[in-house]
Amino acid sequence: MAALAPPVAAIRRAVRRALTTLPDAGPVLVACSGGADSLALAAATAFVAPRLGRPAGLVTVDHGLQEGSARRATAVVDWAHTAGLAPVEAIRVDVSERPGGPEAAAREARYQALTEAAGRLGAAALLTGHTRDDQAETVLLALARGAGPRGLAGMPTRRWLGEALLLRPLLEVSREQTRAACTALGLAPWTDPHNTDPAYARARVRSEVLPALVRALGPGVLDNLARTARLVAADTAALDEQATVALDGVRHPDGGLCVGGLAGLAPAVRGRVLHVWARELGARPGALSHRHVDALEALVTGWRGQGAAYLPGGLRVFRRAGRLTVVDPCPPA
């Protein structure tokens, strides 16, 4: 018997670790584009899940952005059936009328489709093939836009996606390993042309910035960027817990926040309290930026009698009688 290729073994171990942490015995789904990362993940899941007594299926999303995308989706479905995965679905989405750039629109449509599929199929978890290299790219993009700790924490290994857990088992596996695993298993992954299209910021980071960093600083830079994300994520989680407790301590019975209590908090905790409160008020996470939180902060620590701080959705926050008070958007005339 031929020895198991080390990349294949590494990916199977990563999948086993992820699946053994699931409390629910329900099925898992792999989100698979047909690229090397998700294909290697799907192959590992098809091997590991049955040995843990867990059903495993696959979902592929066709964004319709490239010629032949429907054929690619059909090829993924056909392979999944031969690999023993079930249920298997291909979902076509329309990204043409969604707001934002094409990357953001495709991502939003994809995750909406995956969330609906996981709910419809009763999945306990949805697995995606994001790798260490994806994590390094995410950290660099966050640095470039001046993100805070939450952005520098990168992609979490798990989070809720509707009623299912979204798992990223391969965040400590390199892209080189997923490609090598596909080669060892005789799989022919699809290459997404968008991954090398310089019109996209992530593609430029992937093809230009990361290779330059590796040449200048050595190959360990990718591991170190991913490690930074893990360390920052741990610190962020601890601060978030403190902020949850602190928020309860500064709430006013009318739903506002007591300025005196806010002023006594450490700045890192206070910023999180204001961010969480703004989300509770209805500000969408994707629209809520550091500028909105800074405006709330100014009502606490930079008070000069100024007017309202404005939040996404038309919400207005005033400082009145020693507390922050929200006013709903004005109704249309």
Swiss-Prot record:
The keyword Cytoplasm applies. It is an enzyme of class 6 (ligase). Gene3D superfamilies: 1.20.59.20, HUPs (3.40.50.620). Its EC number is 6.3.4.19. GO terms for molecular function: ATP binding; tRNA(Ile)-lysidine synthase activity. It comes from the Bacteria. SUPFAM superfamilies: Adenine nucleotide alpha hydrolases-like, MesJ substrate recognition domain-like. Disulfide bonds: none annotated. Its main location: cytoplasm. One of its GO terms (biological process) is tRNA modification. One of its GO terms (cellular component) is cytoplasm. Keywords: ATP-binding, Cytoplasm, Ligase, Nucleotide-binding, tRNA processing. It is found in: Cytoplasm. It catalyses: cytidine(34) in tRNA(Ile2) + L-lysine + ATP = lysidine(34) in tRNA(Ile2) + AMP + diphosphate + H(+). Ligates lysine onto the cytidine present at position 34 of the AUA codon-specific tRNA(Ile) that contains the anticodon CAU, in an ATP-dependent manner. Cytidine is converted to lysidine, thus changing the amino acid specificity of the tRNA from methionine to isoleucine. PANTHER family: TRNA(ILE)-LYSIDINE SYNTHASE-RELATED (PTHR43033:SF1). The N-terminal region contains the highly conserved SGGXDS motif, predicted to be a P-loop motif involved in ATP binding. Belongs to the tRNA(Ile)-lysidine synthase family. This is tRNA(Ile)-lysidine synthase. It comes from Salinispora arenicola (strain CNS-205). The gene is tilS.
